[in-house]
């Protein structure tokens, strides 16, 4: 489990990215880079790092499922992930 402060920071950053998304898009399209520079630093989507939805873990993130590899394995073994089966060959 990630630190609560890191998870909270990530949520704040996501909110800022969503809040400024349309403004950033229009400023970029119009080439108004000075105004773009004045926006909050955390409003840039490139500063976000994918985190597990369940635990907040930043590493081992599986983009297709939105969770970390550890939680993926646990949920797959329990049969909680539809369409996921253990491989055998």
Swiss-Prot record:
Coiled coil feature spans: none
Keyword Transmembrane helix: no
Listed GO MF terms: rRNA binding; structural constituent of ribosome
Keyword Ribosomal protein recorded: yes
Pfam family, one: Ribosomal_S14
GO biological process per UniProt: translation
Alphabetized UniProt keyword annotations: Ribonucleoprotein, Ribosomal protein, RNA-binding, rRNA-binding
Superkingdom: Bacteria
GO CC entries: cytoplasm; small ribosomal subunit
Protein family per UniProt: Belongs to the universal ribosomal protein uS14 family.
UniProt-listed NCBIfam families: PRK08881.1
Subunit and partners: Part of the 30S ribosomal subunit. Contacts proteins S3 and S10.
Biological role: Binds 16S rRNA, required for the assembly of 30S particles and may also be responsible for determining the conformation of the 16S rRNA at the A site.
Annotated PANTHER family: 30S RIBOSOMAL PROTEIN S14, SMALL RIBOSOMAL SUBUNIT PROTEIN US14M
Protein name: Small ribosomal subunit protein uS14A
Organism: Listeria monocytogenes serotype 4b (strain F2365)
């Amino acid at each position: 489990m990630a630190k609560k402060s890191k998870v909270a920071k990530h949520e704040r950053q996501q909110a800022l990215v969503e809040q400024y998304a349309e403004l950033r898009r229009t400023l970029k399209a119009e080439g108004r880079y000075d105004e773009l520079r004045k926006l909050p630093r955390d409003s840039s989507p490139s500063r976000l790092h994918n985190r597990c939805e369940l635990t907040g873990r930043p590493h081992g993130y599986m983009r297709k499922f939105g969770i970390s590899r550890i939680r993926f394995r646990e949920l797959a073994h329990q049969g909680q992930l539809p369409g996921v089966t253990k491989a055998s060959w």
